[in-house]
From Swiss-Prot:
Organism ancestry: Eukaryota, Metazoa, Chordata, Craniata, Vertebrata
GO cellular component assignments: endoplasmic reticulum membrane; plasma membrane
Pfam families on file: Zip
Membrane-crossing residue ranges in chain numbering: 7-27, 45-65, 81-101, 159-179, 186-206, 217-237, 252-272, 282-302
Organism of origin: Takifugu rubripes (Japanese pufferfish)
Protein name: Zinc transporter ZIP1
Amino acid sequence: MEYLLQVKIAALVGLLFLTLIFGFIPARVKWFRDTDGTETHRTVLSLISCFAGGVFLSACFLDIIPDYLSDINTELHARQLETSFPLPEFIMAAGFFTVLILERIVLNCKEMRATHEERTTLIPERKSGHGHGHGDGPDPESSGHHVHVDFQAHSPFRSFMLFLSLSLHSIFEGLAIGLQTTDPKVVEICIAILVHKSIIVFSLAVKLVQSAIPPLWVAAYIGVFALMSPVGIAIGISVMEAQLAAGPLIQAILEGFAAGTFVYITFLEILPHELNSPGKQLLKVLFLLLGFSIMAALSFLG
């Protein structure tokens, strides 16, 4: 048992440092943060982002949802909770709608604040006698749609929810290591998670850099995300020691919320933003498939 604990601690440290390395490449390299580059630069960034979208799509369908459904069904059968109601899917939908409602609240507050600031700006202009139109000035009605779309595409809230859902999933991946009882299984799962998480954190960092999040917060997100799998390993070790009866069921329910959150972020944030932007459509789809295929191959081999 002592040697098994040492193996788990080594896995904890390895996951932490490798995640930090791959996460800080997009965050610290100026090339990824340059939004005023050449057309070629913007195209390459867009293709990298499409690749990341394929990674997240694969993570959604081939990793997060299957893991959740397997865990929740195992727990329901173990507790002999038989029902015709699709409870696993309902829990996932609850996570989806939780993010949807929270985002609508945030957007509504932002729009109300923007409207208030607009009125505050217009009143002094009218008092100073500048009520006539300016032909060269921006038209609020015509530009509002574009501002709205851009905000939606790079919403810091959505980036945070992407970070949160991936962080929760990382905790559960760490739990899978912490709950193992044999050395070979710990090493096997750890290697699979190392490869998987390196690609995921790189893709997450690309998305965070492209959003309206300050660099310091991007670094904080990556640092916290890197800690999630080690935290999961520590929790798994603690659960094994404490032998909590309800632990696996609580884990499965939280996985369902994380899966629903991830479905929302993948299909309402990442894919629409990448595929609706103009230019190189077939090449974007190709890179989307490439990201998906690489993760699918890793899942197949793992």
